[in-house]
Curated annotation (Swiss-Prot):
One example of a Gene Ontology biological process annotation: response to antibiotic
Periplasmic side: 31-42, 92-98, 153-158, 233-243, 296-298, 357-365
CDD domains per the UniProt record, alphabetical: MFS_TetA
Protein name: Tetracycline resistance protein, class B
Top-level lineage group: Bacteria
Cell compartments where the protein resides: Cell inner membrane
PANTHER family: MAJOR FACILITATOR SUPERFAMILY (MFS) PROFILE DOMAIN-CONTAINING PROTEIN, MAJOR FACILITATOR SUPERFAMILY DOMAIN-CONTAINING PROTEIN 10
Protein keywords: Antibiotic resistance, Antiport, Cell inner membrane, Cell membrane, Membrane, Transmembrane, Transmembrane helix, Transport, Transposable element
NCBIfam families for the chain: tet_MFS_A_B_C_D, tet_MFS_B
Alphabetized InterPro entries for the sequence: MFS (IPR011701), MFS_dom (IPR020846), MFS_trans_sf (IPR036259), Sugar_transporter_CS (IPR005829), Tet-R_TetA/multi-R_MdtG-like (IPR001958)
Length: 401
């Protein structure tokens, strides 16, 4: 682990803060250009537009970081984000908001490249720990960002966008002057490697190498959209919670989630292996879903938050397993693909689970959790079956970082 690893964590923290900063004020900014009854539709489209661009372009940018190095792609992404936020800050028409989100989604590769830096600079046995820290950094940024954005929004709905632009400019300077390249692009002079980094064959290779792991990853991310989609609706309906109680619960979940990813995921993976960490995370999440389906008292939600947060150890461990099985010249492509899959669930999940919750609500508001639990049972069985094979035992395959 070197200074570039730590800088990758800082980049992720600041990137998440920038995303979180604008969320509280984006509806207010929209109100300057459109009628109130149209705000929800445009807000949803703007969020979906960013996610859709990430689905399309994150794999390509990840592959470019394999070909040209992590540093130039990071700098490109940070420039794109800075321009996006400045465009939003100075926006005087609706099309400027759409253009800004479009550009940010296209150039937003910081998450994939930061994960690639972790893969480049850490040993196989320590990778889950650092992927956990990466997830925790993003989570803390998403907690701090909306708080800062909420206060800054009291001054002007444009203020948080200036702050977000400043954060990205600062991060750009950090990468420019202190970040050392972690990808040896001289590896790409090998004919086979060079062809792969310049074509889409790398994705075919990844899908052939670990199809079940990618399916498990996508499915787990998709199920994770259930609480993200229905939490406010469910807690208001069953427990009569107001916005303050919902806010407390979400803040508590975010904080606990970061703690588990930072301090628990790596310890479990080191002591008992990545497979155990993945399974324990899925079991914790599925147990939380089972409790949420049946509890009738609001205070019982808070102990369940510990189980939900405990589920946060699964994906860093799974990401570690996949990274260990991936060659060094494919790490950027893998991390870009994972970002793409994650954002795809962010587009599909809210649409799918909002419809399911709405249609099942007249019968019973717990059905959404039972459906999620059923999917988790399938994922757990897949994980136990596939990850018992020797090649999935990442901790036993020490590869050079």
């Amino acid at each position: 682990m070197n200074s570039s690893t730590k800088i990758a964590l800082v980049i992720t923290l600041l990137d998440a803060m920038g995303i979180g900063l604008i969320m509280p004020v984006l509806p207010t900014l929209l109100r300057e250009f459109i009628a109130s009854e149209d705000i929800a539709n445009h807000f949803g489209v703007l969020l979906a537009l960013y996610a859709l661009m990430q689905v399309i372009f994150a794999p390509w940018l990840g592959k470019m970081s394999d070909r040209f190095g992590r540093r130039p792609v990071l700098l490109l992404s940070l420039i794109g984000a800075s321009l996006d936020y400045l465009l939003l800050a100075f926006s005087s028409a609706l099309w400027m908001l759409y253009l800004g989100r479009l550009l940010s989604g296209i150039t937003g590769a910081t998450g994939a490249v930061a994960a690639s830096v972790i893969a480049d600079t850490t040993s196989a046995s320590q990778r889950v720990k650092w992927f956990g820290w990466l997830g925790a950094s993003f989570g803390l940024g998403l907690i701090a960002g909306p708080i800062i954005g909420g206060f800054a929004g009291e001054i002007s709905p444009h203020s948080p966008f200036f702050i977000a632009a400043l954060l990205n400019i600062v991060t750009f300077l950090v990468v420019m002057f202190w970040f050392r390249e972690t990808k040896n692009t001289r590896d790409n002079t090998d004919t086979e490697v060079g062809v792969e980094t310049q074509s889409n064959s790398v994705y075919i290779t990844l899908f052939k190498t670990m199809p079940i792991l990618l399916i498990i990853y996508f499915s787990a991310q998709l199920i994770g959209q259930i609480p993200a989609t229905v939490w406010v609706l469910f807690t208001e309906n069953r427990f009569g919670w107001n916005s303050m109680m919902v806010g407390f619960s979400l803040a508590g979940l975010g904080l606990l989630h970061s703690v588990f990813q930072a301090f628990v995921a790596g310890r479990i993976a080191t002591k008992w292996g990545e497979k155990t960490a993945v399974l324990l995370g899925f079991i914790a999440d599925s147990s939380a879903f089972a409790f949420l389906a049946f509890i009738s008292e609001g205070w019982l939600v808070f102990p369940v938050l510990i189980l939900l947060a405990g589920g946060g150890i699964a994906l860093p461990a799974l990401q570690g397993v996949m990274s260990i099985q991936t060659k060094s010249h494919q790490q950027g492509a893998l991390q870009g693909l994972l970002v793409s899959l994650t954002n795809a669930t962010g587009v599909i999940g809210p649409l799918l689970f909002a419809v399911i919750y709405n249609h099942s609500l007249p019968i019973w508001d717990g059905w959404i959790w039972i459906i999620g639990l059923a999917f988790y049972c399938i994922i757990i069985l897949l994980s136990m079956t596939f990850m018992l094979t020797p090649q999935a035992q990442g901790s036993k395959q020490e590869t050079s970082a």
